[in-house]
Swiss-Prot record:
Localization (cell): Cellular thylakoid membrane
Membrane topology qualifier: Peripheral membrane protein
Identification of the protein by name: ATP synthase gamma chain
Gene Ontology cellular component terms for the protein in this record: plasma membrane-derived thylakoid membrane; proton-transporting ATP synthase complex
Species this protein is from: Prochlorococcus marinus (strain MIT 9215)
Annotated family: Belongs to the ATPase gamma chain family.
Pfam families: ATP-synt
Described purpose of this protein according to its UniProt entry: Produces ATP from ADP in the presence of a proton gradient across the membrane. The gamma chain is believed to be important in regulating ATPase activity and the flow of protons through the CF(0) complex.
Transmembrane segments: none
Signal peptide coordinates: none
Superkingdom in the source lineage: Bacteria
InterPro entries recorded: ATP_synth_F1_ATPase_gsu, ATP_synth_F1_gsu
Source organism phylogeny: Bacteria, Bacillati, Cyanobacteriota, Cyanophyceae, Synechococcales
Length: 316
């Protein structure tokens, strides 16, 4: 039987670890709420921008507009934007997104391309920089805000635009983690450039809200549908030409897409960390209970042994 002091020390250590994991779970929950608030705050701008672009689209055919962000040219080179976290302790979040990038990269190589990587997050940077002989890294971004802001998306968007407009890349794809629920998220691949006119003004969108029910954290998701009141009046007169308007608005739309990917990734990371820390807390509780049982058995055995020795000594 193990030494009583060793078991007692182990119990104290496990209980202290549980306090840490529980605190990390609560911190992650609070940050999910902040991420939710950030999404809601950015929603009005994104909605109005989509309405303006829809209004322009209703008047002119985007295909007839000479905008470099809409031009589809022969694809000779491709850039992949990969979004991971700066930190670990979030379950399989980073591993899953890196695997998705590896799979997509291998697919493009088989098609005869040599993709460039634009890496966001220390985990992706560390992983792919250790494999420079297999991957081409164009640029890196790290230490972004845990609740992404427009400033965070600006630098990434500028890098993407520079790659596409200079024709170093003919297509830009972004690989990020889509937030589904607190216990479910999935890596997805989305084409950023060239922009698709049909996908610029979506009919429906989703937002998430973190709520509580019976002392448990839950996520409510709802569709945001366009209403007639949100549509811009049809008699609005634009002073600039469609080309000028789109040259100004499309980069904003692209930046909003990047920001959305960052926000979804951040929410997914925090949700995965909540789940991981919750599981760690449950495991610590179970381990502490098992150790307590072992300690009590060891203590009982020691007391029994002492009694037997005393009884044996008195008989002698």
């Amino acid at each position: 039987m193990a030494n009583l002091k060793e078991i007692r020390d182990r119990i104290v250590s496990v209980k202290n670890t549980r306090k840490i994991t529980e605190a990390m779970r609560l911190v992650a929950a609070a940050k999910v709420r902040r991420a939710q608030d950030q999404v809601l705050k950015s929603r009005p701008f994104a909605d109005k921008l989509a309405r303006v672009l829809e209004n322009i689209q209703s008047r002119v055919q985007f295909e007839a507009v000479d905008s470099p962000l809409l031009s589809k040219r022969e694809v000779k080179s491709i850039s992949l934007v990969c979004i991971t976290a700066d930190r670990g302790l979030c379950g399989g979040y980073n591993t899953n997104i890196i695997k998705k990038v590896e799979i997509r990269y291998a697919e493009l190589v088989k098609q005869g391309f040599q993709p460039n990587l634009i890496l966001v997050g220390k985990k992706a940077i560390g992983f792919f920089q250790n494999r420079k002989d297999r991957y081409v890294i164009k640029s890196t971004f790290k230490e972004l805000e845990q609740v992404p802001t427009v400033k965070d998306s600006e630098g990434i968007t500028n890098e993407i635009l520079a790659e596409f407009l200079s024709e170093n890349s003919d297509r830009v794809e972004i690989i990020y983690t889509k937030f589904i629920t607190l216990v479910s998220c999935a890596p997805v691949v989305q084409t950023l450039l060239p922009l698709d006119p049909q996908g610029i003004a979506e009919e429906n969108d989703e937002i998430f809200r973190l709520t509580t029910k019976d002392s448990k954290l839950l996520v409510e998701k709802s569709n945001i549908e366009k209403s007639d009141s949100e549509k811009l009046p049809s008699d609005i007169v634009f002073e600039q030409s469609p080309d000028q308007l789109l040259d100004s608005l499309l980069p904003l739309y692209l930046q909003n897409q990047v920001l959305r990917a960052l926000q979804e990734s951040a929410a997914s990371e925090l949700a995965c960390r909540m789940t991981a820390m919750n599981n760690a807390s449950d495991n610590a509780k179970e381990l502490a209970s098992t150790l307590n049982l072992t300690y009590n058995k060891a203590r009982q055995a020691a007391i029994t042994q002492e009694i037997l020795e005393v009884v044996g000594g008195s008989v002698v």
